[in-house]
Amino acid sequence: MFRTVLALAAGLLVALPSGAALAQADGFGVAPQPRPGNLASFTLRGGVQVRPEFPGSDEYEVGPDLGFRFGGLEIGRFGIGDPDPELVQTGLGLRGSFRYVGERDSSEFEDLRGLDDVDDALELGVGLAYRQDAYQVFGDLRYGVTGHEALVGEIGADVFVRPTNRLTLSAGPRVFFAEDSYAQEYFGVSPAEALRSGSLEPFEAEGGALSAGIEIGAQYRLNDSWGIEGAVTYDRLLGDAGDSPITEAGSDDQYGVRVGLTRRITFGF
């Protein structure tokens, strides 16, 4: 059922006009008056984050945080978004979506002894968002091109407050969905694994809404090229993700913190 819903959502995205389909992360609308020449702009983020060691864990690790956000693209008379870093692009548009999920080496955790290891995963996909000056709503759809090879999705919303023209504060809810194979990969326990473990019961995890939470973020623009960005997240594991023996040995409350520098790059070609 979940795969069918995601497939329909993907079909709707594909059916959008081809101009909109070229939009990437945070690229909204089509620029009505493109500048002469070819231009492209995007923002890279690099920093550190604190996150659970694996989904359902009550232990945390510090690791790198990377991000990408699309700004604008102009080719001849055709344009999407805008290279202007001060412009708040509004309306309905597509955006890119990606997420990295680290590996799980079960031998490193006493509670997971006997379970199969889980490879790290890179999820790539697209999202549809509607944005205004004071808020946005969005839905993202991704596929694990490495690792779990499952469809996952996220829906959410944000409200924006801008105390100054350089500082943007945001806050909003998030709900994460995944299909059965993802849920089984991270939260399931096969009979063979349960036998090897000696402490965990067999558990067949099903997909659906696996977590719900909130993200509170801040962006500060140092100048036209550089900025500082951070966020605090909280997610509560739901459904079989929350009922899993793996989670019961850890925690269904999942926290995260990230902070990093952003660099906006604009170039002609």
Annotate the PLM regions.
Residues 24, 86, 150-154, 158-252, ...:
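Outer-membrane beta-barrel transmembrane domain signature
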Residues 48-54, 72-74, 98-104, 132-134, ...:
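Transmembrane beta-strands of outer-membrane beta-barrel pores
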Residues 53-60, 118-120, 142-152, 208:
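Solvent-exposed loop/turn segments connecting transmembrane beta-strands
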Residues 46-50, 66-72, 82-87, 126-130, ...:
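Residues on the lipid-exposed face of transmembrane beta-strands in outer-membrane beta-barrel proteins
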Residues 7-17:
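Bacterial N-terminal signal peptides
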Residues 22-76, 269:
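Short glycine/proline- and aromatic-enriched beta-strand/turn motifs that initiate or cap beta-hairpins
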Residues 51-54, 110-114, 140-144, 199-204, ...:
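Extracellular loop and loop/strand-boundary signature of outer-membrane beta-barrel proteins
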